[in-house]
Regions:
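Middle-to-C-terminal accessory/interaction subdomains
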Residues: 1-4, 9-11, 16-204
Length: 205
């Protein structure tokens, strides 16, 4: 929910997940998170920042996703789910841990990106992506917190009816994070094959 991974069960695609059953308990095992944070069918920046926590699906009705719908229809499980979201906001965003981790990873790889002659983006584009990711994460956490405390609608219907209550994405541009299907060169980033990231030219809020 927080990372808005729509290349999964929660979107019209309903893909990239396993269901594991053991002793009558079912566990959902999602995978392929490279298009999280709105990288897949995410729409504009505002729709990603304010993705509704209580109807966390895209392009499909909740009733078509019973693994989510049945869970959130149960009051006890809904409260527990909200508790997990609050824990993530408190322990990864509100305390600065998310931003700290991104900056630490940037410090590890920044020089390698700068000197990589085969990179899919320029160094300036990479640095812009880092700062954009930090902004996106913090705005997303702000919206989730508002949805949890009731100041922001937590369903698609509620948000459509009250757009003025949503967190503003400002001039945040998701394409600054890169998008699949591009890259440099005639083979979309890879010699002899598709892949890679393309930067710039995307939609703002």
């Amino acid at each position: 929910t927080i990372v808005v991974n729509l290349d999964s069960y929660s979107s019209i695609m309903a893909q990239n997940y396993y269901i594991y059953e053991r002793n009558g308990k079912i566990t959902i095992l999602p995978w392929d998170y490279n298009l999280a944070w709105g990288g897949f069918q995410g729409g504009n920046a505002s729709s990603v920042v304010n993705f509704p926590i209580d109807t966390p699906v895209s392009g499909v009705d909740m009733s078509r996703r019973p693994l989510i719908d049945k869970l959130l229809s149960n009051k006890e499980y809904l409260e527990r789910y909200h508790g997990y979201l609050q824990h993530l906001v408190d322990n990864y965003f509100a305390n600065g841990k998310f931003e700290e981790k991104i900056k630490a990873l940037d410090a590890l790889i920044s020089d390698y990106v700068k000197n990589d002659a085969t990179a899919f983006c320029t160094y300036d584009e990479y640095k812009k992506a880092v700062s954009t990711f930090i902004t996106l994460g913090n705005l997303r956490a702000q919206s989730v917190q508002g949805q949890l405390d009731g100041s922001i609608p937590s369903t698609t219907a509620g948000q459509n009816a009250n757009p003025s209550k949503l967190v503003s994405a400002g001039n945040l541009n998701l394409s600054d994070l890169g998008r699949m299907g591009g890259g440099r060169g005639n083979n979309m980033g890879f010699p002899g094959g598709i892949g890679g990231w393309q930067f710039g030219g995307g939609q703002q809020d």
